[in-house]
């Protein structure tokens, strides 16, 4: 009776990953997205500077279209590279109810939607449900395989993840078999959504977009309050 070793499992996971990647990329080349009005800042800016760095403009302007932080703005964020907190929502912080957290800026949890979903442990770690059709000016989710980030369970709050799960650097270890399974699942979900939308009637697509977007638009209040 033959026994499988850890190397066999890694090779099998790698083979599955490469097969899924080939299928995914085969359909992605012809549908390269043009993002229109969506902000084009890179992920490092979004995680560490968006609504973190103080706005340098002294003249009055529209806060909701400005990527920088302003005095009294609910969307302001603590810098995750200098303040240690996780991407888990704080149970005592409620923007709508104006409930202040008793721990203040030293709280180990995220305050508000922007701190939660722009945290390095969360940002673009899940596929966007709208996929290529996403029209949000600010979206916390990945719209293709290059945007998808894989973050380990033990990722530190101040440690950024690799820019892409398909590229590695000297400082970044290769994806583990478990990471590969997550990548494969995410790519399969993206491909399934694209295939469904390509044959669905436009009215059904619009209704589905409205239903899917509804629970995700709560962060708009963070910009307006």
Swiss-Prot record:
PROSITE patterns: ZF_C3H1. It comes from the Eukaryota. GO terms for molecular function: DNA binding; zinc ion binding. Residues 155-210 are annotated as: Disordered. A zinc finger (C3H1-type) spans 84-114, 123-145. Keywords: DNA-binding, Metal-binding, Repeat, Zinc, Zinc-finger. It holds the Pfam family zf-CCCH_AtC3H23. This is Zinc finger CCCH domain-containing protein 10.
């Amino acid at each position: 009776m033959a026994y499988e070793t850890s190397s066999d499992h890694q090779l099998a996971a790698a083979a599955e990953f490469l097969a899924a990647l080939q299928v995914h990329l085969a359909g992605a080349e012809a549908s390269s997205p043009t993002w229109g009005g969506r902000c084009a800042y890179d992920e490092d800016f979004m995680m560490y500077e968006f609504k973190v760095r103080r706005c340098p403009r002294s003249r009055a302007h529209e806060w909701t279209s400005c990527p920088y932080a302003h005095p009294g703005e609910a969307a302001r964020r603590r810098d995750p590279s200098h303040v240690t907190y996780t991407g888990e929502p704080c149970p005592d912080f409620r923007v709508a109810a104006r409930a202040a957290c008793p721990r203040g800026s030293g709280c180990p949890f995220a305050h508000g939607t922007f701190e939660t979903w722009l945290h390095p442990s969360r940002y673009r770690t899940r596929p966007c449900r709208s996929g290529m059709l996403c029209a949000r000016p600010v979206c916390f989710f990945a719209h293709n395989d290059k945007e998808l980030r894989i973050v380990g369970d033990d990722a530190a709050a101040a440690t950024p993840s690799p820019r892409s799960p398909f590229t590695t650097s000297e400082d970044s270890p290769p994806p583990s078999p478990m990471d590969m399974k997550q990548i494969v699942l995410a790519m399969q979900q993206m491909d399934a959504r694209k295939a469904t939308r390509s044959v669905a009637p436009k009215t059904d697509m619009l209704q589905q977009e409205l239903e899917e977007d509804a629970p995700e638009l709560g962060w708009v209040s963070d910009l307006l309050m």
